[in-house]
Design a protein with these regions (language model features):
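P-loop NTP-binding catalytic core
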Residues: 1-18
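Switch/coupling sub-region of P-loop NTPases
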Residues: 19-25, 40-167, 176-177
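Walker A (P-loop) phosphate-binding loop of P-loop NTPases
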Residues: 29
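Conserved lysine of the Walker
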Residues: 32
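Hydrophobic positions on the alpha1 helix immediately C-terminal to the Walker A/P-loop
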Residues: 35, 39
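Phosphate-binding/switch region of NTP-binding enzymes
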Residues: 161-196
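NTP-binding/hydrolysis catalytic cores, primarily Walker-type P-loop NTPases
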Residues: 187-261
Length: 261
């Protein structure tokens, strides 16, 4: 199978379209940015999309017709680092100003600092749909990674920060480059809450590696498949419905777990 199944991609697209923020986690070269760019390219043309990137611009999401007329509402922003604090334009600075433009969807290239971590989370918790990426080793450790970033600057209790992150990003996607250099979405989870020092989350989809087969030339091929593990919670279902998804579209994600792909 490919990096994900059609159902998995449809689910993630529906989340972004219907107001559920998504964080894509993984190491360098795992395909995080590629997946994020694909998801943002599927934002409906009538939604206002603003992206914020650091360093170089990787997104080009402006759509045009055959005559070159722009079809969608997209603004791409880049940071401009400076030693002079008065001239330094970082992601946190841009995020604050982006919110005044009333975007429907915000794409934050990557969360690297404490300020970005909390600013992006607060943007999501105040009704904006955020799609971002972060370096992390698994779905479940992603929330703790966000919390650790935020702790570098903000003297807040761990449990409060964890609750903020879980509320801000109900959906976490973990990507990985496997031994044969193929890139897979390894897992999608739904985070529901953080109580008594424990993350309450459940897996929705997983990629299960069955074997790593080496041929006569010494090249490895990964054998595996994607599997549907669980269903979205009633609260996420209600949120999607409240934000405009049809029961027909929702039905696909409510089918009992089975082998997919």
């Amino acid at each position: 199978s490919g990096s994900a199944t059609a159902e998995m991609l449809h689910f993630l697209t529906a989340c972004i379209r219907y107001g559920v923020s998504v964080c894509i986690a993984g190491s360098t070269g795992s395909g995080k940015t590629t997946i994020m760019a694909w998801l943002l390219s599927n934002v409906p043309n009538n939604r206002r999309l603003i992206t914020i990137e650091e360093g170089s611009r990787e997104f080009d999401l402006v759509k045009r017709d055959a005559q070159g007329n722009i079809l969608n509402s997209v603004v791409h922003l880049l940071t401009r680092p400076s030693e002079n604090p008065a001239l330094n334009i970082n992601q946190d600075f841009l995020l604050e100003r982006v919110l005044r433009k009333h975007p429907d969807v915000i794409g934050v290239g990557e969360m690297r600092s404490a300020a970005e971590s909390l600013s992006a989370a607060e943007s999501s918790r105040t009704g904006h749909t955020v799609c971002t990426t972060i370096h992390s080793n698994s779905c479940n450790s992603t929330y703790r990674r966000m919390m650790t970033l935020a702790k570098r600057k903000y003297n807040m209790d761990d449990s409060i920060l964890m609750q903020i992150m879980v509320e801000a990003y109900p959906i976490i996607v973990f990507t990985k480059q496997l031994e044969d250099r193929s890139r897979k979405i390894m897992e999608i989870i739904e985070g529901e809450d953080y109580q008594d020092g424990r993350l309450i989350a459940h897996s929705l989809y997983k990629y299960e590696v069955e074997d790593n087969v080496t041929d006569d030339r010494g090249e490895t091929r990964v054998v595996g498949h994607h599997k549907k593990i669980g269903l979205i919670s009633d609260s996420l279902k209600k949120r999607l419905l409240d934000n405009g998804i049809s029961n027909k579209e929702l039905e696909e994600f409510m089918q009992p777990p089975k082998e997919v792909g």
